[in-house]
Amino acid sequence: MGTINDAVTEAMAKCNLALGLVAEANALVSGNATGNGIVFIQHHCDLLIERGFMSLFETLESYLESVFICYMLGEVGINGNAVIRYVNPINSEHAEKILCGKEKYIDFTSRSIITTYAENFFLHGGPFLYLNNVSQDFEDMKKIRNKLSHISIKSQREFESLVRSRISYLPTNVSVASFLMTNLPRQTESFFVHYMNTTIGIINALANPAVPVP
């Protein structure tokens, strides 16, 4: 089990890799790249964009769990501030057992579960209640992940509802990749970059908790 600093370093590196993958995919398709007689087409680009997003979401999920356990073990944030905890595990394995209880695992893709556990284990939920400040983006990202992971009517409907709520209409045959490459209304930032910046914001906020107020 690494430190909070280790978790931040690893997560930031993976965010940059995901962004690089998407940028390179777009560059290849716009340049009509070929290799061994195979032309790099939009379909290939879309697959890489979607893989880049999945990598981003997996990075966030892993980071949330790692930092949660670090604070359970009494580690202070990068800014030197401590999080007052209600548990005192002896090591990371013990922390995982306390955290999971009778469950096989804790769903670190669920904002409500994370914040509920945080309020049970830390004073005022520690820094994890920051997730409520980015609730829409967090829920969006999970719905997009579900669309990529599950072939179901529910995941498709949730994705289409997300698209409508974000850009006010549903493009014909909209895909996850095409949505992620769409700019936010009246902005020059794509949804992929927006969600990446949200992820980076979460990484920094959780690693730098506020001074605890009893």
Predicted regions and their residues:
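Polyanionic, low-complexity intrinsically disordered segments
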Residues: 2-31, 133-136, 151-214
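Short, Lys/Arg-rich flexible segments
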Residues: 25-38, 42-45
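Short, functional N-terminal and low-complexity linear motifs
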Residues: 35, 83, 112-114, 163-170
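Helix-loop junctions and short alpha-helical segments
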Residues: 39-144, 157-158
